[in-house]
Every structure is written in C-alpha cells, then in structure tokens.
Design a protein with these regions (language model features):
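Hydrophobic core residues within well-ordered beta-strands of beta-rich domains
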Residues: 3-5, 90-91, 104
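Conserved positions in beta-strands of structured domains
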Residues: 6-10, 76, 81, 95-97, ...
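Compact, glycine-rich, soluble single-domain proteins
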Residues: 31-58, 69-72
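Catalytic strand-loop segment that frames the active site of acyl-thioester-processing enzymes
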Residues: 1-40
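Hydrophobic beta-strand-centered segment that forms part of the acyl-chain substrate-binding groove
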Residues: 52-91, 128-131
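Short, hydrophobic/aromatic-enriched beta-strand segments in well-ordered soluble domains
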Residues: 21, 93-96
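HotDog/MaoC-like acyl-thioester-processing domains
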Residues: 14-16, 85-87, 95-149
C-alpha cells in the first residue's frame, strides 16, 4: 500500500527541499487513528520526511547512477511534538547532510500549519535519517522482474 505524503513541492535546491501535505479526514489511515481524536500517525510524519528526502536525493546529479529505489536505512534522534489534525497542513523541510558511500544523511523538520494561525509554526517531528539504495538479492530481483512484467 502506498500513501503519497507530498501534495506539493514548495522549494527544491540541490541541498534542500520544502514540501506540503494537506491533511484531511479523507485519508484512510485517520479513520482508526484515533476514532474520537483523529491525528496523523507519527510514522506517517516520518514517511512524509522520507518521501521529501527521496525527491531531494533523486533530483541531484550525483544520484543519476542509482539502480535500486531509495529506502529508509536508519533513523536517529527523532522527536515528536505537536499533533497534526485534519484541516491542518504538514510543512516538511529536509536538508542534505553528508553523502556517505551509497547513503545520504538527511535532516528533517515538519511543522504544523493550522488555518488562521499566526506566529511560528509548531514542530510536529524532527530528526535525522539515512536513505540508501534497496538491497535485493539476485533471486529476489529475478522474481521481482517476473512479477512486474
């Protein structure tokens, strides 16, 4: 199952991306998280940062040789803050840190944009994470190719 957690790319440079996700009650994962107090699940906030980070890395010249999709390799120092309720938007900013051997070290922060709010937007989640190419054995790759044809 795939959830697209990037509605719009607001800014994109080789070192930074800013995206926006509008959260609505139409999102199927909100139906039971939680029934009487719907909020965006924390793992979906992290996934929004991962999807933004993936777009950032894939837009760079030094990622042109990728043979496999980028996947989440590691999460560090993840901190959650404010709940994200339907009607609000999640503004995600991801910055590229070091490019390691076959890995990209990223730092992300997602803030809550509530309708009519003034002042600084509260942080929903922040942390560091690593994206790397998926590691698939040759047997799995053959099976994957047979299934997708």
């Amino acid at each position: 199952m795939h959830f697209d957690l990037v509605d719009r790319v607001l800014e994109l440079t080789p070192e930074r991306i800013v995206t926006l996700k509008q959260v609505s009650m139409a999102e199927e994962y909100l139906q039971d998280h939680f029934a009487t107090f719907p909020v965006l699940p924390g793992v979906m906030m992290l996934e929004a940062m991962v999807q933004a980070g993936r777009r950032l890395v894939e837009s760079r010249e030094d990622s042109r040789g990728l043979r496999m999709p980028l996947v989440l390799g590691k999460v560090r120092a993840l901190k959650y803050g404010r709940f994200v309720k339907p009607g609000a938007a999640l503004r995600v900013e991801v910055m590229l840190g070091k490019k390691l051997e076959g890995e990209w070290d990223l730092r992300g922060e997602a803030t809550v944009i509530e309708p009519g709010a003034v002042g600084e937007a509260p942080t929903a989640v922040s942390g560091r994470f690593i994206l790397r190419e998926a590691r698939i054995s040759s047997v799995a790759a053959i099976h994957r190719d047979a299934v997708t044809q």
